[in-house]
Each structure stands twice: as structure tokens, then as C-alpha cells.
Amino acid sequence: SSVVVGVTDTNFDPTHEELQGKYTYMTSGLTNSNIAHGTSVAITIAGGTDNSLGKSSIGYNTQMQLRGMTYNEILAASYAGAKIINASWVSGCSFSQYAQDVITEAYNNGSLIVASAGNGTTCGGASNLAYPAAYDHVLSVTSVGPQDNHERFPGNSLITHQHNTAVDICAPGYD
């Protein structure tokens, strides 16, 4: 495949059946099969789609780099050829010039950084900015429920996603 996606996260299970043959690189020290966040994100992005197992991904015939959850790893993924770099994590609630410079460098190198806008309790509330999603040159993604609800359970603001001025796109979420 000519498409390489950098997945920056933690807790990948490299032995998972949906990841077999799907990644070209994995930063050492990121494995933990008991916690599924990195594995789940990687499978959604580019897990096996034609193996009659589990769930199909959105990135048929796509390869991944499985990398750590840092700005240095975003830059490393970019220079290693990742055209798309996922960051389904929050590093903080305030702007960092260093982090913005890294994002800009990866962007100028031809990489699109896609980041989750954050969970609603992140940074003090759903309307507050969370980073890296709020940086320039990042495609910030949030979700909405089937009744245009921001909360997983309407009326329960403890389980929600960020909906702020940095959000670029809203995808279907929850059930």
C-alpha cells in the first residue's frame, strides 16, 4: 500500500489478529494487551478488513506505524513517511509553542495530523480547548449522537466530547 498512517498512542497489542501484517514499525515499550486504547484505535484506522475476523477498518490496504503518544513521535512518523498521523489523546489544556512548532514542521513535511477534540470533562468542560487538537494545522474531530446529542447519555455531561472553536469536523458517535 502507498498509504502509511502514523498512529500515536499507547497500549498496542501487536499480537492481535486484526493487526497482523498491518504495521511496518512499532516503537518499543508500547505493548499492553490488557488495556485496549491503542489497539482499538489502530484497528479502526487500518486493521484487517478482509479476514472475516472482528471488525473492518476504514483504511483498507493501509499500513501503519505504531508510535508513542508524544510530539516527538508525531514528527518521527512524519519523517518516516506517514502522510496521515492520528492523535487520539490529549496532552494538555494550554498552548505550547514547542508543540505547535512540531505540528507545523510535520504539516510542512506533508503530513496531515488528525486529533480527537477531547472528552467533555477534559480541560474543565466540553467547550474548552484541548491539545493537540486545538493547534493550527491539525484536523480536530469530535462526535455527536443520533439525536444531535453531545452527551453519551443525554443530560449527563460527565460522558461527552469536546465541542469547541477548534473543531473542524463532527462524525457520528456513540450508538
What is the meaning of each model-derived region?
Residues S1-L30, S40:
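Acidic-leg catalytic submotif of subtilisin-like serine proteases
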Residues G59-T62, A171-G173:
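Short, small-residue-rich loop/turn micro-motifs
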Residues V3-T10, A130-D175:
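Extracellular S/T/G-rich loop segment that most often corresponds to the catalytic His/Ser-adjacent loop
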Residues V41-I45:
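Buried hydrophobic packing segments
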Residues K55:
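Short, solvent-exposed loop/beta-turn-alpha elements that line the ligand-binding surface or hinge
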Residues P14, G48-S52, N61-H137, S143, ...:
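Substrate-binding/access-modulating region of protease and related hydrolase catalytic domains
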